[in-house]
């Protein structure tokens, strides 16, 4: 049994220095105050290994006690519970953080627990060999995996879908260049905002090039960069590079960096208010259109430069 309560000694009280008589007291519980953290454990656990603690509780070293009988150890008590677990049964669950493992190893060295020191050294070496990159971009393998990534993310999400195999026609002259520019912009944004936004790639989706933006598990906007145009007597696929719009939507998702809590005002900040809907729209139509903002790029004919569509913002 252990605790983490800070002990405030009474004013004027002085610790008592004495030798601990541990003979025949293996099952006796002792009270330890390690840097203000309080622990109860048995003498048997403290003397199982040949450590400094065994020397303290076998009478070979003097110990300090306060007037309430707590044995004082002038060390940080943060990892002492972990040390006790190791002393009891030689097993341990190490912290995930490299820094905390280093802290634990420093305490193990102080108490001369060589087995625990070796375990920490091995774990640190393994972490060094399996170094995780600072900017880690997952490539999704299924819709289920995508849903889980987005739902579990504590950050806003930006997804780039690009899949040339979905194309049924030839490309316009600038499409390949624009596709590369979209990918390059994705990489640039990943390097710039990887600490604040989760960037994911999708190479199995049904589009050729499409950006999606999510906040608090909800899809906020979509920028579709492809369209079908007519050149002479055949159809062609056109890929655009709406750089300004992509930057705008990426900055918009940063509004959703806050912890995932219900925040209707934030969710409505980038969506059209109900009062702006035309009177002719019924409730079902409004709910459908209010679901997500989709942005389609300008579409031009490569045959006679007639504009087939215009830049529009609507909800799907």
UniProtKB/Swiss-Prot annotation:
Post-translational modification: Phosphorylation at Ser-280 by CK2 facilitates the nucleus localization and increases interaction with PCNA.
One GO cellular component term: endosome
A Pfam family assignment: BTB_2
Region spans: Disordered: 268-288
GO biological process, one term: positive regulation of DNA replication
Subcellular location: Cytoplasm; Nucleus; Endosome
Main location: cytoplasm
Recorded superkingdom: Eukaryota
Residue(s) carrying Phosphoserine: 278, 280
Involved pathway(s): Protein modification; protein ubiquitination
Gene3D superfamilies attached to this UniProt entry: Potassium Channel Kv1.1, Chain A (3.30.710.10)
InterPro entries: BACURD1-3 (IPR045068), BTB/POZ_dom (IPR000210), SKP1/BTB/POZ_sf (IPR011333), T1-type_BTB (IPR003131)
Residue ranges of every copy of the BTB domain listed in the record: 28-96
GO molecular function: cyclin binding; identical protein binding; small GTPase binding; ubiquitin-protein transferase activity
Biased composition (Polar residues): 268-279
Protein family membership: Belongs to the BACURD family.
Reported function: Substrate-specific adapter of a BCR (BTB-CUL3-RBX1) E3 ubiquitin-protein ligase complex involved in regulation of cytoskeleton structure. The BCR(TNFAIP1) E3 ubiquitin ligase complex mediates the ubiquitination of RHOA, leading to its degradation by the proteasome, thereby regulating the actin cytoskeleton and cell migration. Its interaction with RHOB may regulate apoptosis. May enhance the PCNA-dependent DNA polymerase delta activity.
Subunit structure, interactors included: Component of the BCR(TNFAIP1) E3 ubiquitin ligase complex, at least composed of CUL3, TNFAIP1/BACURD2 and RBX1. Interacts with RHOA; with a preference for RhoA-GDP. Interacts with RHOB. Interacts with PCNA. Interacts with CSNK2B.
Protein name: BTB/POZ domain-containing adapter for CUL3-mediated RhoA degradation protein 2
């Amino acid at each position: 049994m252990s605790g983490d309560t800070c002990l405030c000694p009474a004013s004027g009280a002085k610790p008592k220095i004495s030798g601990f008589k541990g003979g025949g007291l293996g099952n006796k519980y002792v009270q330890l105050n390690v840097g203000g953290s309080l622990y109860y454990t048995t003498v048997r656990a403290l003397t199982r290994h040949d450590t400094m603690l065994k020397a303290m509780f076998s009478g070979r070293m003097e110990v300090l006690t306060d007037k309430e009988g707590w044995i004082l150890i002038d060390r940080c008590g943060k990892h002492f519970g972990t040390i006790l677990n190791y002393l009891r049964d030689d097993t341990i669950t190490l912290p995930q953080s490299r820094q905390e493992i280093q802290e634990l190893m420093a305490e193990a060295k102080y108490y001369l627990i060589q087995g625990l020191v070796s375990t920490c050294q091995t774990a640190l070496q393994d972490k060094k060999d399996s170094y995780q990159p600072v900017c880690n971009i997952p490539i999704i393998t299924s819709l289920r995996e995508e849903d889980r990534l987005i739902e579990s993310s504590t950050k806003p999400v930006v997804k780039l879908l690009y899949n040339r195999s979905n194309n049924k026609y030839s490309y316009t002259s600038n499409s390949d260049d624009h596709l590369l520019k979209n990918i390059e912009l994705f990489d640039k944004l990943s390097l710039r905002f990887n600490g604040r936004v989760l960037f994911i790639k999708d190479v199995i989706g049904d589009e050729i090039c499409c950006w999606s933006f999510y906040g608090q598990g909800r899809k906020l906007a979509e920028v579709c960069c492809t369209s079908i145009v007519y050149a002479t007597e055949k159809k062609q696929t056109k890929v655009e590079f709406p750089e300004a719009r992509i930057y705008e939507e990426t900055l918009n998702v940063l509004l959703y960096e806050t912890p995932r809590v219900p925040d209707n005002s934030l969710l409505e900040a980038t969506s059209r208010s109900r009062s702006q809907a035309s009177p002719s729209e019924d409730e079902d139509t409004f709910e459908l259109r209010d679901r997500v903002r989709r942005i389609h790029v300008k579409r031009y004919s490569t045959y006679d430069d007639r504009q087939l569509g215009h830049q529009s913002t609507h909800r799907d």
